[in-house]
Design a protein with these regions (language model features):
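Active-site neighborhoods and metal-handling regions in enzymes and metal-associated proteins
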Residues: 1-197
Length: 197
């Protein structure tokens, strides 16, 4: 049955002569409070329990189809990364290089958006870091930093020019067919110095 809004579920169950649930499991850790109350209110006689732990456990076990989808996602991601050295041209900034890499990813089928936790956390594709910006700390709970283009998103590329003799860290996520992966590689523009700094 096509369902446009949750309220239709009650009508369909009644129409088909099916019993209303006595126990309702909702993702209590992830649903906004108002949505939780709305859904629970559809079945006022049902016991409502937090189903998040069970749902997470079920999602942690992958079917053969899901494993194949991850494999295909990884292959598309790797295919885009193989083209990265050819996307560089002298005079580019890190943001220009990032845009070119994102273009390569999208051409391989990357969806370009990443929902990573519940309904309210999405991340950008990732970071291309070089020069002093590569050592800039992150305000977030992940390894890479960078100043970013704006305080609204303080992470990633910041228009640093790419220069001969520099390393370039490319760490982009890929969301292909709804299955996400992450890939990090370090490239160099010309020969790198033996010393890190």
């Amino acid at each position: 049955f096509p369902i446009r809004k949750p309220e239709q579920i009650v009508d369909i169950l009644k129409e088909k002569g099916l019993p209303l649930p006595t126990k309702l499991m909702l993702e209590g850790d992830e649903l906004p409070y108002t949505e939780y109350v709305r859904l629970a209110g559809l079945f006022p006689d049902a016991e409502v329990v937090n189903g998040t732990p069970l749902i997470r456990q079920a999602r942690s076990v992958k079917t053969a189809i899901e494993i194949e989808m991850f494999r295909r996602s990884g292959m598309a991601h790797a295919k885009a990364y193989e083209q990265i050295p050819f996307a560089y041209y002298p005079g580019m900034t890190d943001i220009e290089f990032s845009i070119e890499i994102e273009r390569l990813m999208r051409l391989q089928g990357c969806l370009g958006i990443f929902r990573v936790f519940g309904r309210s956390m999405e991340i950008f594709m990732g970071s291309v870091l070089t020069g002093d910006n590569a050592g800039y700390p992150s305000p977030y709970d992940f390894a890479l930093g960078g100043r970013g283009l704006d305080p609204a998103l303080p992470g990633g590329a910041d228009k640093t020019p790419l220069k001969e003799g520099q390393s370039v860290m490319v760490d982009l996520g890929g969301n292909f067919n709804g299955y996400m992966g992450d890939m990090s590689r370090v490239f160099s523009i010309g020969k790198l110095s033996e010393e890190a700094y």
